């Protein structure tokens, strides 16, 4: 039997770089919120212990794909603690809607969905804390998708505090370029000393993203899309880009602006949600 599992996008409603550690990682403060839009992962259980990704990504080796890595990590962790039923395996496929290198968390969300779904389907019984800890070894954004609630993140993104920001409507636009995260974080002009503030203070301030100035400077496509969106609504970069988003109070307002978009602007409208569609599907 094949089951389908949501793998939602996320937005960074704000992102501030507060420092850089000796190991090179940047410390930050950011606000994650999910979208009711994303990829869909289909899973069919196998009884011979094999993991097979039926929809490979061009240019990514099978064993390097985050989906496969997540499945194998769960398999090993559960087996090591005697919680993996004999023969547990899976055929996995993905209906990919989220762009790579877009700042929407697609790969991290895929990994989290696989961890949560296979833990349920294989009946391993690992806790959310255990799954989140495993997820952190796959990527800094994986734990928030595992836990499934909008969150204020600190440290390198691993310290999560659940929050409930307003659930607005967003026009999310992809400028047609992919921005590797290191390109932004290695830029010498990236702001790295934004003062730390409490979540209460940050929620009262106008939101912004410290990475935006670098993305706009280095990628004219990002600058062009943001310049157009800013004529209609508050707009900013998500993550390290390349996607940008404009926020609206209603779906109709967002769709009206999308209908006016120039042909070169590729976008979609989605609602911000504080409970992940993955976790809603499991209720």
From Swiss-Prot:
Cystine bridges: none
Gene Ontology terms, MF aspect: 4-(cytidine 5'-diphospho)-2-C-methyl-D-erythritol kinase activity; ATP binding
Binding site for ATP: 99-109
Catalysed reactions listed for this entry: 4-CDP-2-C-methyl-D-erythritol + ATP = 4-CDP-2-C-methyl-D-erythritol 2-phosphate + ADP + H(+)
InterPro entries cross-referenced by the UniProt entry: GHMP_kinase_C_dom, GHMP_kinase_C_sf, GHMP_kinase_N_dom, IspE, Ribosomal_Su5_D2-typ_SF, Ribsml_uS5_D2-typ_fold_subgr
Keyword terms of this UniProt record: ATP-binding, Isoprene biosynthesis, Kinase, Nucleotide-binding, Transferase
A Pfam family per the record: GHMP_kinases_C
EC number in record: 2.7.1.148
Pathway listed: Isoprenoid biosynthesis; isopentenyl diphosphate biosynthesis via DXP pathway; isopentenyl diphosphate from 1-deoxy-D-xylulose 5-phosphate: step 3/6
HAMAP family, A to Z: IspE
Assembly information from the UniProt record: Homodimer.
Family named by the database record: Belongs to the GHMP kinase family. IspE subfamily.
Function per UniProt: Catalyzes the phosphorylation of the position 2 hydroxy group of 4-diphosphocytidyl-2C-methyl-D-erythritol.
The protein's name in its UniProt record: 4-diphosphocytidyl-2-C-methyl-D-erythritol kinase
């Amino acid at each position: 039997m094949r089951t389908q599992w949501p793998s939602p996008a996320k937005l960074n409603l704000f992102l501030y770089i507060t420092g850089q550690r000796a190991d090179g990682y940047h410390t930050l403060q950011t606000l994650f919120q999910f979208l009711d839009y994303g990829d869909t992962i289909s899973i069919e259980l196998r009884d011979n212990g094999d993991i097979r990704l039926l929809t490979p990504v061009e240019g990514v080796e099978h064993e390097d794909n985050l989906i496969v890595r997540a499945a194998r990590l769960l398999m090993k962790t559960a087996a090591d603690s005697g919680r993996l039923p004999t023969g547990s395996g899976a055929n996995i496929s993905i209906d990919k809607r989220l762009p790579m290198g877009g700042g929407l968390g697609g790969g991290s969300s895929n990994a989290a969905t696989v961890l949560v779904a296979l833990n349920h389907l294989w009946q391993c019984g690992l806790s959310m804390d255990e799954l989140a800890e495993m997820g952190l070894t796959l990527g800094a954004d994986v734990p928030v998708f595992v836990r499934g609630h909008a969150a204020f993140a600190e440290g390198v993104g691993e310290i999560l505090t659940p929050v409930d920001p307003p659930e607005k409507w967003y026009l999310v636009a992809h400028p047609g370029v992919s921005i590797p995260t290191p390109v932004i974080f290695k830029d010498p002009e990236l702001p790295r000393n934004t003062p730390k503030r409490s979540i209460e203070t940050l929620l009262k301030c106008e939101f912004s993203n410290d990475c935006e100035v670098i993305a706009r400077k280095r990628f004219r496509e990002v600058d062009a899309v943001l310049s157009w969106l800013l004529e209609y609504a508050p707009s900013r970069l998500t993550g390290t880009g390349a996607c940008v988003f404009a926020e609206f109070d209603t779906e109709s307002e967002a769709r009206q602006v999308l209908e006016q978009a120039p042909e070169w602007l590729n976008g979609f409208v989605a609602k911000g949600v504080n409970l992940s569609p993955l976790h809603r599907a499991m209720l």
